[in-house]
Structure formats: C-alpha cells, structure tokens
Amino acid sequence: MICDDVMDEKCRMLDCHVSQVYEWLYYEIRGCALDPSRMTWEEKKAYLLEHWGTRYENAANEAREALIASYGDAGKNARYAETFELSPYGRKVSVEEFRELMRP
C-alpha cells in the first residue's frame, strides 16, 4: 500500500510514543536520549523519517513490482509503502480480493 500521502500522519503517531522513539531508539543509536520537548515539529519529523521512514522506503523498493501491478504509474513513483502478506490462517482470499481490501 502506498504511504506517500500519509507519512506526516505516521510521523505524528510515532511522535506520540516518546519513550520508544526519542529515548530508547536514540539511546540505542547514539548512547543518550533525545529531549523532544526542545525540538520543533520539523526536527522531529526529519528524525522520524530518517530512523523510521527508511523501513517504508525499503518496503516500496522491495515491493516495486507489486506496487506497479496494483497502482500503475503511481506504484512506479511511490517513495513510501507498507507491505502486507496473505496469511495461511483464517479465511483464504484471492489476490484480487486482497488488493481490493487494501485500496484506499
């Protein structure tokens, strides 16, 4: 699923998890915690995209063929994506039904 249009919302949701994304994660990377109260939203968003956005960029690159098959040119140009897989458990769905469920 292409996420380009919702990355700001995804960053705002991550911003709510202060201890995980500013304290623990930054400590793991740099050996100290960040103080988000001293950061502007632009600084926070840049930090979140640098450390969390790459997983969505990697997903878009790895799923490029599927994105193109599902979204055409938009899939070719997508920067961020979230990937899902069909589960072997529960109700079986076809690829077409799965794509329909994932459409915005």
Task: Describe the function of each predicted region.
Residues M1-P104:
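C-terminal accessory domains and tails appended to enzymatic cores
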